[in-house]
Design a protein with these regions (language model features):
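GH16 jelly-roll
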Residues: 1-155
Length: 155
């Protein structure tokens, strides 16, 4: 996975992080993200800049940019619903290219307003009141260096 520190794709501005056994935490304000709007935060397993790709290309599980690569959706949300999920790909070829990915995602977690256990929505009556900023933490589990699952919690 690479994180961008710029508004456009520039391979010199990406850096690789390993999330296995780690976590990602962030604060989010979804108060103005209503129905029909998706606020997204996701990570993709882009090839390293030193790979044989020329020019360096963006990729994701939907083949945006012309290439497939693994994707993890940390957040597809608005003030009424929240979704996380992982998109696996087949094994990469010798050149590091993937020929297909799961575009719908696996291990999906959907949190909807009035779902009970999660108590999420735009009102003070909800435990997670999306009219105000809240914190999200996603922990990535691994065994022997392989992704085995994740949990996402709100505070």
């Amino acid at each position: 996975m690479y994180l961008s520190t710029v508004e456009k794709i520039d391979p010199s501005k990406y850096f690789k992080v390993n999330l296995l056994g780690g976590s990602v935490s962030f604060d989010i304000d979804l108060s103005k993200s209503g129905c029909g709007c998706i606020t997204a935060l996701y990570a993709v397993g882009m090839p390293a800049a030193e790979n044989s790709f020329s020019p360096f290309q963006y990729c994701d599980a939907s083949k945006t940019g012309g290439y497939y690569c693994p994707e993890f959706d940390l957040m597809h949300a608005n003030r009424h619903a929240y979704r996380t999920n992982a998109h696996r790909c087949d094994a990469p070829s010798a050149t590091g290219l993937y020929s297909s990915c799961d575009t719908t995602g696996q291990c999906a977690v959907d949190i909807l307003q009035n779902e009970g256990d999660y108590d999420y929505g735009p009102s003070y009556i909800y435990t997670i009141n999306t009219q105000k900023p809240f914190s999200v933490n996603t922990v990535f589990y691994e065994k022997d260096g392989e992704f085995t699952g994740y949990t996402t919690t709100f505070v």
